[in-house]
From Swiss-Prot:
Annotated positions of the Phosphoserine modification: 120, 122, 125
Major location (coarse): cytoplasm
Organism whose genome encodes this protein: Canis lupus familiaris
Protein family: Belongs to the NDK family.
Protein name: Nucleoside diphosphate kinase A
Source taxonomy: Eukaryota, Metazoa, Chordata, Craniata, Vertebrata
Activity: how regulated: Autophosphorylation at His-118 increases serine/threonine protein kinase activity of the enzyme. Interaction with the SET complex inhibits exonuclease activity.
Length: 152
């Protein structure tokens, strides 16, 4: 498919503990995106510090890393047309109070510190994040039988 891209989506410990994994996957599948990698992982401090390196000087950095280590994370790679931009719209605003109903955060979150999900904010960030969380052989390339019903 032309112009296809990949994004990294992570369901944070609060989303896993609240049993929202299936609902979140369902939304991405129903939109028409293709899941090409997924794993349940207890993220290490080193992985999280590298993932959030852009936030290292922020006052909440240490708490964020500690929180992300507090439970399992579901790491995923999704593929599709404009999946980075569309995925971010589906997630809603970082602060759930600013998120519209119908978005993941608008429907399931109250506080910014428990916003249940992370999504890459650019194609470049997605490539970096996918490389941090997955080995190349963990990405499964296949043709979905629904692809012709989703894309022209």
């Amino acid at each position: 498919m032309a112009n296809s891209e990949r994004t990294f989506i992570a369901i944070k410990p609060d989303g896993v503990q609240r049993s929202l994994v299936g609902e979140i996957i369902k939304r991405f599948e129903q939109k028409g995106f293709r899941l090409i990698a997924m794993k349940l992982i207890q993220a290490s401090e080193d992985l999280l510090k590298e993932h959030y390196i852009d936030l290292k000087d922020r006052p909440f950095f240490a708490g964020l890393v500690k929180y992300m280590q507090s439970g399992p994370v579901v790491a995923m790679v999704w593929e599709g047309l404009n999946v980075v931009k569309t995925g971010r719209v589906m997630l809603g605003e970082t602060n759930p109070a600013d998120s519209k109903p119908g978005t993941i955060r608008g429907d399931f979150c109250i506080q910014v510190g428990r916003n249940i999900i992370h999504g890459s904010d650019s194609v470049e960030s997605a490539e970096k994040e996918i490389g941090l969380w997955f080995q190349p052989e963990e990405l499964v390339d296949y043709k979905s039988c629904a692809q012709n019903w989703i894309y022209e």
